[in-house]
């Protein structure tokens, strides 16, 4: 299906969607207010006649916030998808609004179906070229979605590190990959304990802006439990397939580093992710175990499904010691036993 985005020379701040739909019907929705977090963003009206749909969006004020513009694109995608629009034309009077509308639309238009016949990455095809910065944003967001969509037999600590390394611009970012022996030598014992039950070896990835000053401005930290069974304190089987997502924090960190590696920044940054699997086996760590953390604090394990804080405790402490950041931003999926 095709999507066409146009900037037209009009003085009013409005956006119009014209689309062909498969069903013949007649519907009219008078102007309603679209709100986000209780803020009024825009007014919209929908008219459907025969096999044509027309969506009119009137901005309540000129949107200076690009996020609000992206909300419009997301909304247009939802309407197009709801009515199975086969060919759409989107027209607006403002090139900047159009750019961010397209970005919001494209962020929604993502399908990960590589394991299916006739797989595709999106529903709509468009010739519209995003600016370099917005294209980089979209690619980084989609990279994140791809990482978390993969099953755990495809994305595990080592394969995660290989995939991420290939996707980061190493002319501007240095990457270190620490394997089990190095992790053990450093003393990231809590992270090692979580991975004890897995046949896969743990990995710690470090990223840093080339030629960064000693004390970085921002350190990004990500929890990367590539599969979380709960360990000896095993989770219920229902829904356990979703535990491939427990590396979401590491995926977010990697996608941010990917984005930053392709732009010029006026701040220094570093990133660190701890990649493990939390599996039950004869070698797994157990409730009642006592582990000495990287900081030297003894930690008693009461529930092996509370593994995320153990991984984070070690990599945050280690990352802060190495990079001495002014700000730490950590990303983690922490649920269940917390």
What residue spans do the PLM features occupy?
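Buried hydrophobic packing segments
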Residues: 76, 252-260, 312-319
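Short amphipathic alpha-helical segment within the helicase RecA-like ATPase core
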Residues: 1-217, 221-224
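Alpha-helical metal-binding/catalytic segments enriched in His/Glu/Asp
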Residues: 164, 218-220, 233-277, 308
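Short, conserved micro-motifs enriched in small and acidic residues
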Residues: 66-71, 154-155, 240-251, 302, ...
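Short acidic, glycine/serine/threonine-rich loops at helix termini
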Residues: 98-103, 187-190, 230-234, 280-286
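Fold-independent oxyanion-binding glycine-rich loops
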Residues: 21-23, 59-60, 178-181, 207-209, ...
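Glycine/charged-rich beta-loop-alpha catalytic/anionic-binding loops adjacent to active sites
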Residues: 51-60, 142-146, 185, 216-219, ...
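A glycine- and small/hydrophobic-rich beta-loop-beta segment
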Residues: 263-270, 274-338
